[in-house]
Amino acid sequence: MNRFTAYAALFFIFSLCSTAKEAGFQHPAFNFRGTSTMSALSGDYSAAPTPLYKSWALPSSLNLTTQPPPLLTDRSYYELVQALISKMRLDCQTVGDMTWRHLSEMLFASWNSVKEVSLKAASVTLWAIISIWFGLYWTLARLITLFLWTFSIEALCLILLGCITSLIYKGALSLSEHLPVFLFMSPLKIIWRAAFSKRNYKNEKAVEGYKGFSVPQKPPKSAVIELQHENGSHLGYANCIRLYSGENALVTAEHCLEGAFATSLKTGNRIPMSTFFPIFKSARNDISILVGPPNWEGLLSVKGAHFITADKIGKGPASFYTLEKGEWMCHSATIDGAHHQFVSVLCNTGPGYSGTGFWSSKNLLGVLKGFPLEEECNYNVMSVIPSIPGITSPNYVFESTAVKGRVFSDETVKELEREASEAVKKLARFKSLTGKNWANDYDSDEDYGLEKEAATNAPAEKTAQTNSAEKTAPSTSAEKTAPTNKPFKWASGTARQNKRQLRHPRRRYKRTTNGQNGRTDHHSYGGENQSLGDRGEDSEQGVSESPAEAQTKQTRKTWREEQAKQFTSYFDAIYKWGAQEEGCPPGFRKCGNIPGYYHPRTKGETKWGQKLCQVHPELADKTAGFGWPKAGFEAELQSLNLQAARWLQRAESATIPGAEARKRVIEKTVEAYRNCITNAPLCSLKSKLDWAGFQQDIREAVQSLELDAGVGIPYIAYGLPTHRGWVEDHKLLPVLTQLTFDRLQKMSEASFEDMSAEELVQEGLCDPIRLFVKGEPHKQSKLDEGRYRLIMSVSLVDQLVARVLFQNQNKREISLWRSVPSKPGFGLSTDTQTAEFLECLQKVSGAPSVEELCANHKEHTRPTDCSGFDWSVAYWMLEDDMEVRNRLTFNNTQLTERLRAAWLKCIGNSVLCLSDGTLLAQTVPGVQKSGSYNTSSSNSRIRVMAAYHCGADWAMAMGDDALEAPNSDLEEYKTLGFKVEVGRELEFCSHIFRNPTLAVPVNTNKMLYKLIHGYNPECGNPEVIQNYLAAVFSVLQELRHDRELVAKLHQWLVPSATTKEH
């Protein structure tokens, strides 16, 4: 019921609304024409207009009456709402019109104001400019008028001279139109270049002090060819290499290309280098890689050789080839290091050697550039081949073959690769005047009879191989590349026609790159995506690392650092520090102790030696007066007391030269050693220690270690007594590397200037130095006195630190001993070496001949020897030696000087460790440590500098032995703290020079005693017998000039029974 009532109500309401709406829309006021719509919409229903009726349509008798306007309440809700909405819209329109009218008036007024102000400002500005300009002219006119009025005659003369000069210029200009301009410009250019230009490099140099060899030998694969001028005269050399793109190419110095002809010694053919297209060319690096016209390899009869790019070049021996009288000669060279973007090479070159390649076995390393002029460096430089993916390097990663470490740092390699990438892209963008380049030509079907392959039939991609690539030739047409005056004919034949040519390397490079900084497309060669020059911190090859590789590297680094910390804690735990002043040697104090890890035993005479002396009394007479010293901490302490007392006694009477004298000697020493200028370590080229550069330095340092030498304190505690145990263990070597790096890091950061000797050890800047008696025969007088020769052995880590900081200089001195005063690199084992040394001495001393030098040596030189030299070296001498080292470092940095200063502080203020574990700290700085890496080099230089302090014009030294100028004042040595003895004969390095080819050893009897009492061949051990026989023949070689003695010794020391039974 309720539901029915609700439905009825709704139906009633709906009907009501519908009726009202229908009634409203059909009202006469809305349906007839003429109804005011605006009135209806506005709701003005009180005055609705009357509909218009035609008069003829109305009945005549009908009376019309006016209807009253309907009330609002009579309207429907729909009409009321529509009227209200219309009212609101009209009101809004009215308000908007009023607002727009007022806004327009305001904007118009503002525009007029701004326009008026702008016009006034422009007018004022223009009048200001006019006033200033007019003022300048007016002022200038007044000044000119004043000048002419005051200096009338002078002004008239200037005007006349100006007119004359103008006439002369016009006459010269008219004359130059009928004469070649170069007649005037060429002399001016020559004068300008001679006066103002400066070349940074000269193209040939013979390295002073370097002695190489030359043997007849052909280049590998005949890959070296001669470059000639157009008239046939020699110009330089070029080298044929095999690119990774498959083509053969020529590599030469960029300065050798102009007007050059590639010439074959075998075939006699000549090809102008202008027909070769450069795929890489760098004037800054002075190297060009060029590919030639078709069949150029056959015309020149060459084959492509393998090569090594800049990122893989390491130090070591090398060779280069030149033509001499129509025959190829092989010359020796040594890859020494880096010089800017070049590689420094020790070799002797001459005019016309430019462009020749340096070879390691059958691999090309680079081409000869010349040598630097601005630094007066004593070496040549080599231009290297940059790594260009797809051209000079593969698109995937190799393991480096440079076993001795790379020459260049990562930054230099990145720079070389970046320049190479830019150069290749520049060539790729190059367009000739015709709009079409030779390298853009596809293989010519008319020339070779080949059919172009459709893109759908392209061969499957092949993976590039390391040492074997498909042999190809540049894709070009003979008609486009042959010059007008052809010096040769193109080769043709079925072999040429049947071989499909690959595209030019430049086009190949464009095809394999996406134009994104040289990044290669992984679809090109089957390799990885590789960014040119994108290398990680520790990367050997300069490739981007995957996240997995980066994670692995970080894991290894974390493990290495943690292991180094553990080992450091392990070694620190063995020290027991505690100072004690009583009962210590002079200049030392006891600062602690460690467990006794060393237990040396005193040697005695062997039964073999006693037997030989009994059988051969003459041998007994020769070996009499020698014996073995005692060993152990008591002998060490006894000898240390004697030598330290003498050291301090001499130091008290010595005086330090003044600042000017030291500066003069340092500058003279630097000039004498200028041929040994070397680079700083790679690890210290930046403001902070660089791990990547350190890896290269430590690799070279480890490989130069003496593996059978002792590890020293505290590393003996680990139970591995020699270097070999640490170096050859693949788990311990990374830890050793990290320990060395951590020490260098501490040296670069610590404030060590005021530290004591034991504090340096406690802070981890250095290790104690092991002290022991050297196991060599001593004279009986020294044995009776107890003054034994002490050796101060530096620890393994300190050895590596010294090698990292100084190995470049020390090795250069050894290589160039002929041109520097220090002679650690020379020997006297052969007559040739003896003659060579005497020739060097003759040149330095100014003697007319070697014979005259040997006969009257006192007039030309003075042989001197310092007794107890190591103990006589004062700390200021070590400082001056370090100053010379820093000045001889080409690219020295503040970090390098800081590290070397820390090393000097540690070596001059050391903690000595006796065999029983007693630790003795130096209280007086100084003393050269005999087991240090720098001992031989620094002692020789300090000895030379001491001679300079005594007024010698020249000097040469080998440790404490020296030959110096006769004008040296020997009395001055006492003021320096040295005890110097003058030899009566021409003696140097324990040899007496009798004639130009004869050097007799001084310590013959000592050598014989050590030989017969240092070995026991009767034990039957093959290794002992082998070492004994090697020592015997070494002694016989030293005594080779005394034939009678050699025959006797051979009979005594090498009996037939020994050789037969064993």
UniProtKB/Swiss-Prot annotation:
Q: Where are the transmembrane segments?
A: 121-141, 144-164, 172-192
Keywords associated with the record: Hydrolase, Membrane, Multifunctional enzyme, Nucleotide-binding, Nucleotidyltransferase, Protease, RNA-directed RNA polymerase, Serine protease, Signal, Transferase, Transmembrane, Transmembrane helix, Viral RNA replication
Q: What is this protein called?
A: Protein P1-P2
Q: Where is this region: Disordered?
A: 456-557
Q: Where is the composition biased (Basic residues)?
A: 497-511
Which SUPFAM superfamilies does this entry report, sorted A to Z? DNA/RNA polymerases (SSF56672), Trypsin-like serine proteases (SSF50494)
The chain positions of domain RdRp catalytic read: 859-974
- A Gene Ontology biological process term: DNA-templated transcription
PROSITE patterns associated with the record = PEPTIDASE_S39 (PS51868), RDRP_SSRNA_POS (PS50507)
Q: What does this protein do?
A: Precursor from which the RNA-dependent RNA polymerase (RdRp) is probably released. RNA-dependent RNA polymerase plays an essential role in virus replication (Potential).
> What EC number(s) are associated with this protein in UniProt?
3.4.21.-, 2.7.7.48
Q: Which residues form the active site?
A: H255 (for protease activity), D286 (for protease activity), S354 (for protease activity)
Q: Which residues form a coiled coil?
A: none
InterPro entries the record matches: DNA/RNA_pol_sf (IPR043502), Luteovirus_Orf2 (IPR018019), Peptidase_S1_PA (IPR009003), Peptidase_S39B_luteovirus (IPR000382), RNA-dir_pol_luteovirus (IPR001795), RNA-dir_pol_PSvirus (IPR007094)
Signal peptide as annotated in the record: 1-20
Q: Which GO terms describe its molecular function?
A: nucleotide binding; RNA binding; RNA-directed RNA polymerase activity; serine-type endopeptidase activity; serine-type exopeptidase activity
Q: Residues at site: Cleavage?
A: E204, K205, E399, S400
